[in-house]
Amino acid sequence: PGAVADSLSKYLIDRAQHKVRVLLLLDAFGSQPLKRDWIRKLKDAGVEVVWLRKLRWYTLQKAAQRSHVRVVVVDGKIGYTGGFGLADYWLGDGHHEDQWRESNVRFEGPTVAALQAAFAAAWAEATGELLTGDMFFPRSSFADVGDVQAGLMYSIPTTGSTPAERFFALSIAGARRTL
């Protein structure tokens, strides 16, 4: 797929070969451009690759309900979220038409458990497996780290309003001086 995706696969394969449980959850629609041989190499190395919300004729009414959860959690203690674009045009500086810019954020502390929970919910939807216990939610991940507070809201498209829509609506409705 390109330098970014190839670099990612190299690291995932390395960790899987060192007996680290590596879970990769891909949106079945948004990840279609990934090549089958790229996926096969990951699986052959022991990476657990799972497709979320596969398109079927009987699920077409939900085709637009895609997952945009992009999360990396390392040992339940360090978390990243952001765009995680795998195409090479994300390597650019964002100042040119053919070069985009990507931003990702690193977290430690209680927010990591929230990132893990977002991933775990999608993983459970796709596989039926509940990711629980110290492997995914170590007690140390709930301790405060640093002096910056962060919160995370997980929301996935569904029928009716989502938690994110309600959060923003209530936040806007609660404004008293500025918005």
Which residues does each PLM region occupy?
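Charged, low-complexity intrinsically disordered terminal segments
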Residues: P1-T178
